[in-house]
Amino acid sequence: MKRGDLYWAELRPRSGSEQQGRRPVVILSHDGFNEAPQWRSIIVVPCSTSKLQKGRGPTVVLLTKGTAGLAADCVAVCHQITTLDRSKLTQRLGSLPLEEMRALEAGIRAAIDLDP
């Protein structure tokens, strides 16, 4: 499990407008944490195929079909960064190419108002 990997995850239970259900997530946490067996928490960005999410501006990043094993176009919803127990990750899909990872990082900076 490495930063930039895409996994299927079970996002239940969730509430309100949080992304939920079975969906791809992008691993954000540092590889040092990801590789430590005693560290159970993984920081992720959930993905969505919702057409409503696609128009939400700089905090959503398009990931096209075929990218890192995705079966359909989706968006990484950077304004919904969350922490999961690694047991919620069910299957690795692949790794984001550098260009998409940089776009995701820009989306995160926009979501939490960090300078570039």
Kindly label every feature range from the protein language model.
Residues M1-P116:
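Conserved functional hotspots at enzyme active or ligand-binding sites that engage polyanionic ligands
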